[in-house]
Swiss-Prot record:
Official protein name in the record: Photosystem I assembly protein Ycf4
GO cellular component: chloroplast thylakoid membrane; photosystem I
Species in which this protein is naturally found: Huperzia lucidula
InterPro entries: PSI_Ycf4_assembly
Membrane-spanning segments: 22-42, 64-84
Family in the record: Belongs to the Ycf4 family.
The keyword Endoplasmic reticulum appears for this protein: no
Lineage: Eukaryota, Viridiplantae, Streptophyta, Embryophyta, Tracheophyta
Localization (cell): Plastid, Chloroplast thylakoid membrane
Membrane topology listed for this record: Multi-pass membrane protein
């Protein structure tokens, strides 16, 4: 949902709070917990969960491996839950004609550089470029060409926009910034 006036344009950017990340975090958490809850009862010699009988699992070597997989699986699930909690990668793009400034703001991981804000002068913007690579998983990214620097991506690779939507977004932004548009 973009907001635009005559002098200002704001584009919110979605971060880690996506349905796919929630699904992967749940799957890895449940899988890791399942391995761990099967490995521990094999050490204790008792069934902690009646649905998961562990009497047939010998602690050495199967129980140890199950516990190890359970503990190892908790690390990526913890990482996913933290990125969802902190909403890493979210932010906004501000295009301010009155000030002549473009600000790209993103939230990062907690610490000294949690807030990431990159500023450009509108005078340095040369063009808006659409990168399209059609394959099994197509890649469509909107870039901003900045004088004397690398191209700056404005959309995420995981943003699934159709080619038409991407071109419309690029044309709208190029019109607002009064720059040319390069594309496929």
């Amino acid at each position: 949902m973009n907001w635009q006036s005559e002098w200002l344009r704001v584009e919110p950017i979605m971060g880690s709070r996506r349905i796919s990340n929630f699904c992967w975090a749940c799957i890895t958490s449940l899988g890791a917990l399942g391995f761990f809850l099967v490995g521990i009862p094999s050490y204790l010699g008792k069934d902690l969960i009646p649905v998961l009988p562990s009497q047939q699992i010998v602690f050495v070597p199967q129980g140890i491996v199950m516990c190890f997989y359970g503990i190892a699986g908790l690390f990526p699930s913890f990482y996913l839950w933290c990125t969802i909690l902190w909403n890493v990668g979210s932010g906004y793009n501000i295009f301010d004609k009155r000030e002549g400034i473009i600000c790209l703001f993103r939230w990062g991981f907690p610490g000294e550089n949690r807030r990431i804000c990159i500023r450009f002068s509108m005078k340095d913007i040369q063009a808006i470029r659409v990168e399209v690579r059609e394959a099994i998983s197509p890649r469509r990214v909107l870039h901003m060409k900045v004088k004397g620097q690398q191209d700056v991506p404005l959309t995420r690779i995981s943003e699934n926009l159709t080619l038409r939507e991407m071109e419309e977004k690029a044309a709208e932004l190029a019109r607002f910034l009064h720059v040319s548009m390069e594309g496929p």
